[in-house]
C-alpha cells in the first residue's frame, strides 16, 4: 500500500511539473518566434496534451476552439493590445499591437514599439525599438530603425513606378525586387509613400523629417538630417545629400543628384544636378539670387506693357 501511495504521489508531482513547464515554454515561444522552435522543435498543439484539463487554458494559449482555428492559419492574438501576429514573427514582450493590426510572418518588432489599429506589417519587416506606427499604415519589404515616428496612412515598400514597352508595343512592368531602409529617429508624415528599389535599395537617412503627402520614388537615397515639406515629389534614382531642405511642392526629376546643404524654395523644379551648397529656386531651379532677378525683370517688363 505504501509503495502504491508513493507512486501516485510521484505521478501527481510529475503532472504538475509538466503543466508548469509547458506553460512556461509555450509562453516563451509565443514571444520568441522561429528561434524558439529551433530549441523546442514541436507544435504548440502537442503541448496541450500534457496539461491537466483544469489548467489547460493557462498552460497553452491555443486550448480553445477559436484560438486553435486561428493557429491553423499561423496567426494568433497578441496579448498586449489584442492585435494579430503570425507565429513565426519575433515580437518583444513590451511591444503594443492594437486590435485590428496584423504582423505577418518572419517580421521582427523591437522593444516598446507601438502599432496602431488597421496597420499591416508585411512579411520579414524589421521595426526598431521605441518606434511609433500610427493607424492604417502599410509596411512591406522594409526595415525601420529605432525611435522613428510613422504617422497615419503611410505606405512604405510598395512597387516602384517602372514600366517599359516591349517589341509588340505592350506596356510591361519592370521588376521591383529590393527594399526600403529607414534610419533612426526618422519621422514620416501622414499619407506619404516610399517605393522600394529596383536596382538599389531606397534609403532614408538618420534624423530625416518628412511631411505629409510626400512621394519618394524607387532607388532614391536621401541623406541624414534632411527636411521634406508637404507635397514634395521625388522621381526614381535621385540621390540627395545631408542637411538638404525641400520646400513645399518641390519636384525633382529622375537620376538627379543634389549635394549636401542645399535648400530649395517652394514650387522649384530640379532638372539637373546641383553640386554646390546654397539656396535655389525656380523652374528650372537656379541659384536663388539669379531667380529673384529674373522675377524682378519679368515684373518690370509687364508693368511697361
Region spans (language model):
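Terminal amphipathic alpha-helical/low-complexity segments used for targeting or macromolecular assembly
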Residues: 1-88, 93-94, 147, 153-176, ...
Amino acid at each position: 500500500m505504501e509503495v502504491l501511495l508513493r507512486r501516485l504521489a510521484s505521478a501527481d508531482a510529475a503532472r504538475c511539473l509538466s503543466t508548469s513547464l509547458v506553460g512556461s515554454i509555450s509562453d516563451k515561444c509565443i514571444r520568441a518566434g522561429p528561434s524558439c522552435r529551433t530549441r523546442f522543435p514541436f507544435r504548440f498543439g502537442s503541448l496541450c496534451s500534457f496539461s491537466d484539463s483544469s489548467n489547460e487554458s493557462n498552460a497553452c494559449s491555443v486550448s480553445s476552439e477559436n484560438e486553435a482555428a486561428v493557429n491553423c492559419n499561423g496567426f494568433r492574438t497578441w496579448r498586449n493590445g489584442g492585435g494579430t501576429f503570425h507565429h513565426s514573427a519575433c515580437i518583444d514582450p513590451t511591444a503594443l499591437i492594437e486590435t485590428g493590426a496584423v504582423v505577418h510572418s518572419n517580421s521582427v518588432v523591437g522593444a516598446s514599439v507601438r502599432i496602431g489599429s488597421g496597420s499591416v506589417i508585411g512579411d520579414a519587416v524589421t521595426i526598431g525599438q521605441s518606434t511609433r506606427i500610427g493607424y492604417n499604415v502599410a509596411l512591406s519589404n522594409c526595415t525601420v530603425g529605432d525611435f522613428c515616428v510613422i504617422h497615419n496612412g503611410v505606405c512604405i515598400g510598395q512597387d516602384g513606378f517602372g514600366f517599359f514597352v516591349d517589341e509588340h508595343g505592350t506596356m510591361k512592368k519592370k521588376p521591383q525586387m529590393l527594399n526600403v531602409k529607414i534610419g533612426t529617429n526618422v519621422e514620416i508624415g501622414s499619407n506619404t509613400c516610399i517605393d522600394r528599389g529596383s536596382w538599389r535599395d531606397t534609403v532614408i537617412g538618420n534624423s530625416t523629417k518628412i511631411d505629409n503627402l510626400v512621394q519618394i520614388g524607387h532607388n532614391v537615397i536621401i541623406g541624414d538630417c534632411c527636411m521634406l515639406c508637404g507635397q514634395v515629389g521625388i522621381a526614381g534614382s535621385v540621390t540627395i545629400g545631408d542637411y538638404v531642405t525641400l520646400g513645399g511642392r518641390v519636384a525633382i526629376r529622375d537620376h538627379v543628384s543634389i549635394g549636401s546643404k542645399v535648400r530649395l524654395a517652394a514650387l522649384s523644379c530640379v532638372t539637373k544636378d546641383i553640386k554646390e551648397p546654397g539656396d535655389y529656386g525656380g523652374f528650372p531651379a537656379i541659384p536663388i539670387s539669379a531667380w529673384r532677378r529674373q522675377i524682378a525683370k519679368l515684373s518690370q517688363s509687364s508693368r511697361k506693357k
